[in-house]
Amino acid sequence: MKTCLLTVAASSLFFALSALYAQTPSSGSEATLTANPVYTKNCAKCHGKTAEGRHFAGPSLASPKAAAMSADDLRSMIANGKGHMPKFAAKLKPEEIDALVQQILVINKK
């Protein structure tokens, strides 16, 4: 009986913590970015499906660091890369980069 109760308690704790740490978009702006097929194909692998960031792979796009960047800074980062961020100038059209920039700015309410 104790084993059963311990299993139920551990499972309950696991699910409670999973729900606590689950990251879902806090507003429609993240959903707009992550619904963009260009984002899904080129960005989500490192920045996460909901732009939450993926530890060492890529930072959150809804963060103080991203919020501090101007549209030109974001555009340059996407086009030219920096550090572990690959270059996308040859892979994406300028209007696709601009759409990503605008959506990142919206997430950060600029």
Residue ranges and their predicted role:
Residues 1-29, 110:
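N-terminal export/targeting leaders of redox proteins
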Residues 78, 90-110:
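C-terminal capping alpha-helices of c-type cytochrome domains
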Residues 72-88:
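Short Fe-S-cluster ligation motifs
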Residues 31-36, 48-77:
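Gly/Gly-Pro-rich "capping" loops immediately C-terminal to redox-active cysteine motifs
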Residues 16, 37-40:
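Processing junctions and N-termini across compartments
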